[in-house]
Amino acid sequence: RRSSDLTMLDNLQLLFVYAPVMNVQMLLDGIFIGAVFALAAYGLALVWGVMNVKNLAQGDFVIMGGYLAFSLYHVGVGPIIALPIVALVMFVFGWISYLLIIKRVIDNDMFVSLLATFGLSLFLQQVMNLIYGPEVQTIDSKFPIATMFDGFVTVPMAKVVSLLLAGGFAALIVVFMKKSRTGQAIRATAQDARAARVLGINTDRIYAFTFSLNAAICGVAGVLVSIIWVLQPFYGIVYSLRTFAIVTAAGLGNLPAVIGVSFVLGWVEQYAGIIMGAEWQIAAAVMVLLGVLVWRQIQLRRQRQVVR
């Protein structure tokens, strides 16, 4: 216990001594990791807002996309070229998952959909563990590493590329949702599914497309994870916790808030890692989620008191 306290104090001292340089490094790393969080969280917000399904397999979709890129890499397909391939495969997988699982539980109680997606999560974990093994895997993207401040700040170009790809893909999704007829139908269904049916929108098809689009988004996020971090079959729960924390804090249908909260969570994890150790990074995400839930509950109580 005393040793861990001393380590924390040493890390704090290091952070303050090298504050300008360390803060630049932490802020950059938070932005890089936050961009990937934002993609996965937006997919969850889409499914949650349109279908009222809390997908507990969200993180496993991300890891699955990463493993698909990993497999393609070993047959000579680079991760950037693999992006559209993985997105397409994950889209098809999402459609099949909807037809086999989600469609059967979407009209039931929320607890039923939670159990269904939790079961899907466990299934995917075991399949990935069976195929790829429990070892940590990564892709050598062969991107160079840039340095700043005489080498004290490192900027892996793989992370810069992943940030640009995440931003470009997010922009495509926004344009699609606002300009395309399918995107407008998704938004109409999210606002009022019954009214959308009256207007002639096939909501069942919209639900299938929405869940598939979410899977494709997670697949792209997974490819980016494979470039800049590591893959392991049971890491999905970590990304699921992060996406739920982000969506809970940002709210549904608010993309700027999702992006902002994703960056904040990325920074929180980076500072928690440097001060308390890498094992505290995930704990920081859980604490953020708990803090948001408590804050939401306080806000609801205040609103009820005003109504009374």
Predicted regions and their residues:
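Inter-helical junctions in multi-pass inner-membrane proteins, predominant
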Residues: 21-36, 176-181, 207-250, 273-282
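Cytosolic-side transmembrane-helix boundaries in multi-pass membrane proteins
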Residues: 9-12, 131, 191-205, 275-308
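Membrane-embedded helix boundary and interhelical linker motif in transport proteins
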Residues: 28, 50-96, 100
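Helix-loop-helix "hairpin" substructures at the membrane interface of multi-pass membrane proteins
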Residues: 154-231, 255-260
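Membrane-interfacial amphipathic/re-entrant helices at transmembrane-helix boundaries
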Residues: 7-39, 68, 79-82, 108-113, ...
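Transmembrane helix-bundle core of multi-pass membrane transporters
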Residues: 104-179, 206-209, 271, 276-278, ...
